[in-house]
Regions:
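C-terminal/domain-edge helix-coil "capping" segments
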Residues: 19-40, 48, 135-198
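A structural "domain/chain start" motif
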Residues: 19-81, 88-98, 166, 193-198
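Bacterial N-terminal signal peptides that target proteins for export
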Residues: 1-10
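Structural motif marking the loop-to-transmembrane transition
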Residues: 3-4, 94, 173
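Surface-exposed flexible segments
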Residues: 2, 53-63, 113-118, 122
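Surface-exposed short loop/turn segments
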Residues: 84-151, 155
Length: 198
């Protein structure tokens, strides 16, 4: 019986891990934009930690390079996120000839706790002796992240694309970032805002 319970717990944990996902919830493209694919982008990540910011920006730069786009991490210009003022970013964008600025922000982190009630099953062969077998209840902790990403043209600052993404129980920061980058680059390419992959 103990081995069955342990196996059941392991299965629950495995299924929970399998359900962890990052999804593109919604996206909007400015119909007034007619500038074609953007080929040089400054990448700005506004996350919970400086390490997360740099990791996202560098991963996005690598993914853009694979698509034939010059993507540059803002961390190289502004090590401290507090330096990311409108005026400072605009000056760098104009000076270095960027066509776009991609700003991705961690908007919220929501943590919930769900109590799964015990499951009761008839214990065949022991009915009337032990009564019923009880599978103990357990607590499930969920973490949901909401992320937004906006692409602006430079130097005008026109919004050409905005997306909302969610991630439920990401297994690690690295995997979360990889999923975010893949979803964003795929959608931007599909919409013609980035050039098709060579």
């Amino acid at each position: 019986m103990q081995s069955i319970r342990l196996a059941s717990c392991a299965l629950v944990l495995l299924l929970a891990a399998a359900c962890a996902s990052t999804t593109l919830v919604s996206a909007w493209q400015n119909p007034a934009y007619t500038g074609g694919p953007i080929k040089k982008v400054m990448i700005i990540g506004l996350g919970a930690t400086p390490g997360g910011r740099a990791e996202f920006e560098n991963d996005m730069a690598d993914a853009l390079a694979d698509a034939g786009v010059i993507g540059v991490s803002s961390s190289g210009y502004f090590a401290d996120a507090r330096e990311l003022t409108r005026e400072a970013v605009r000056a760098w964008v104009i000076r270095d000839g960027y066509q776009g600025v991609l700003v991705t922000r961690l908007e919220s982190v929501q943590q919930t706790q769900t109590v799964q009630a015990p499951q009761y099953t008839d214990l065949w062969g022991y009915w009337g002796y032990y009564g019923v077998a009880v599978t103990p209840g357990y607590v499930v902790d969920d973490t949901k992240l909401r992320i937004t990403s906006d692409l602006f043209t430079a130097p005008s600052g026109q919004v050409v694309y905005t997306a909302e993404l969610t991630s439920v129980d990401p297994p690690s920061r690295q995997k979360l970032i990889h999923q975010l980058v893949d979803l964003l680059v795929t959608d931007l390419t599909k919409r013609g805002l980035l050039p098709p992959k060579p």
